[in-house]
């Protein structure tokens, strides 16, 4: 059986990176929530 998690830095950054988050309204809200919460890491 194939494992479901096949790590790739490129895919990770494209889907969950800072620039990907900032590209959409919802993504910007995610960053804002994480800032408000005081997260050390805002995105992947």
Curated annotation (Swiss-Prot):
Q: Which GO terms describe its cellular component?
A: ribonucleoprotein complex; ribosome
- UniProt key word Cell membrane: no
Q: Which biological process annotations from GO are given for this protein?
A: translation
Q: Does the keyword Ribosomal protein apply?
A: yes
Q: Which UniProt keywords apply?
A: Ribonucleoprotein, Ribosomal protein
- Which residues lie in Basic residues bias regions? 31-44
Q: Which residues form the signal peptide?
A: none
Region annotated Disordered sits at 23-44
State the Pfam families in the record: Ribosomal_L34 (PF00468)
Give one GO term, molecular function aspect.
structural constituent of ribosome
NCBIfam families attached to this UniProt entry: rpmH_bact (TIGR01030)
Q: Which family does it belong to?
A: Belongs to the bacterial ribosomal protein bL34 family.
The molecule here is called Large ribosomal subunit protein bL34
Per the UniProt entry, what species is this protein from, by scientific name?
Marinomonas sp. (strain MWYL1)
